[in-house]
Amino acid sequence: MEKEIGIAVFDTGIFSSHIDLRQKTVAFSDYVGRRKNPYDDNGHGTHVAGIITGKRYGIAPECRLVVLKVLDSKGMGKSKDMLQAFKYVIENRQRFNIRAANISIGTGSKGKLSNMLVEGVEKMWDSGIVVVCAAGNGGPYRGSVTYPGVSKKVITVGAFDDEEYMDNVGKLHHNYSGRGPTSECVIKPDFLSYGGNVMSTSHKGGYCLKSGTSMATPKITAIAAKILEKHPEMKPIDVKMYLKEAAVKLNEPLNRQGFGLIDPKEVLKKI
């Protein structure tokens, strides 16, 4: 029997005792509080994890998670912690059969550290891991895709239904999904999926709704894992091309939609 697919989740952690997420986490590494046992003092990571592998709402419930806590209780993090976490995932790729990585994180800051994040995700990609990054919620402006999602290699995901988004300080954003092109004139995002009012697991128990490209991204990560379950021989670029063939073109500019919309239910029917 093929070993269960491992998915690395870079986020705020996980409430692993949630009834939908029990026995899902095979490894937990904390770069914020340096604690050994899984926890989530924000909720973002638990919500993302539930979209991927939760029993009730997860797309790939048979997959297992390698959880990297790189964001604190306010959803803030440091580039150096991200880079350490990238290294951990590459070094433990075979141990946990890590075939995909979800990064519902982004920074709009440009500079050396942001470029290092891009280099880091590309190293993961080159090691055989399908890296899926959020386009960020800084739209609708051109060039608003966040790092490391600007990488031309990785799969970058925007939100199709991005009419409204409430940020963590209570500010309402409209048409928020990050748009390309990147500073290197790369068309981004690569795909869109549904990110508005997504129901998933809460770090307080039960369920809650969240919106943003952070919620659209794990849907694509989970679908990538399902593809790899069926086609374990595929390389990251093969998965990206598979998704390209499955995407539905919309009447939108390329720098808004990339290859088009991925509808999880429709794609899963064809895998």
Where are these regions (language model features)?
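Structural recognition of the beta-strand scaffold that forms the well-ordered cores
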Residues: 7-9, 27, 64-69, 97-104, ...
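Extracellular S/T/G-rich loop segment that most often corresponds to the catalytic His/Ser-adjacent loop
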Residues: 11, 19, 149-229, 233
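Subtilisin-like serine protease catalytic core
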Residues: 1-27, 35-80, 96-99, 150-154, ...
